[in-house]
């Protein structure tokens, strides 16, 4: 063994550990989890109960509903991986597997991200990024779709929460 061999083995392991650590964050940002947990939290506040149900229950409900919503995307991704015969045994196959899984996720994000938010992130990239990189950017790139989707979900969640609050305010006024 050469002295450089352990470092060569360490880098892919380090990349894998970092990628595994980012999976929960990515899962929250590219699913409806954020919207669901915000709506449930606002509903709890509108009811006037601060601790019932507990946050763990709200998060559990949000996870279950998010898995239900994302099931077709997951099924499509698994079918694509099976069709291509990818097992993820080496780094090249792992990269191909990520690309195969990213396509159904991209379609989901494109369907649910508002056009206004996608344009906002394209314009922001043009203002902040180097010009040659910003010109290559399209509105269906994951780097644009993920934050646009998250912002769209937040907007929808607060609109839903506002409607819930209005309903409870009307009930309070009628009862008073």
List each model region and its residues.
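Hydrophobic alpha-helical segments and their helix-loop boundaries in membrane
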Residues: 1-176
């Amino acid at each position: 063994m050469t002295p450089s061999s352990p470092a060569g083995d360490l880098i892919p392991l380090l990349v894998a550990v970092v990628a595994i650590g980012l999976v929960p964050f990515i899962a929250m940002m590219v699913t409806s989890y954020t919207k669901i947990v915000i709506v449930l939290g606002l509903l709890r506040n509108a009811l006037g109960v601060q601790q019932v149900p507990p946050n763990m229950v709200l998060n559990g409900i949000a996870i279950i509903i998010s898995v239900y919503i994302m099931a077709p995307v997951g099924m499509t991704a698994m079918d694509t991986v099976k069709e291509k015969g990818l097992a993820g045994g080496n780094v090249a196959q792992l990269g191909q597997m990520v690309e195969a899984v990213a396509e159904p996720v991209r379609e989901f994000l494109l369907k649910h991200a508002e056009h206004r938010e996608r344009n906002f992130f394209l314009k922001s990239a043009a203002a902040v990024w180097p010009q040659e990189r910003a010109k290559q950017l399209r509105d269906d790139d994951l780097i644009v779709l993920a934050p646009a989707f998250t912002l769209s979900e937040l907007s929808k969640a607060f609109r839903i929460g506002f409607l819930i609050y209005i309903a409870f305010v009307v009930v309070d006024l009628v009862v008073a």
